[in-house]
Amino acid sequence: SPSSIIPKFATEQAACFDLTACFEIGDKIKCIAQSQNETLRRATDRGIAIHPNERFLIPTGLILDIPQGYCVEVYIRSGISYKLGLTLNNCVGIIDSDYTEQLYISVANNSGTAQYIQKGERIAQAKLVKLVETVLEETLERPGLKTDRVSGFGSTGKN
């Protein structure tokens, strides 16, 4: 999109590049409203209004050309999550190398009030990740103990 913002790293040592919201006033943005029905909502001069418990696909205006053997991982920016209560619907977005459509950020409002995303606002961050070729094999035997772990959730570090 001509109005999209090229992703960039915010600092010299930033692990991820920032992704911004790309829309114009009047654009229709896809959302799942409180009624749980998919609908379109228009962006206004205040931005995109995301009410509590609503989910939106925020456009970035970007189409990524991801090399084969890589993926892009997408995370919500910590300030957006902490200050606004917005999260990614799937916690971490995974963009495969064969996806060649516009990138959208799937955002949910977990706060108790409406939140607004502004045009050009940095809402997510992403990184290019090299994939490790993995072969999955079925086995009928449980793996042997590798450490002194004896249980699951919250069990390590206890005597």
List each model region and its residues.
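DUTPase catalytic domain/fold
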Residues: 1-159
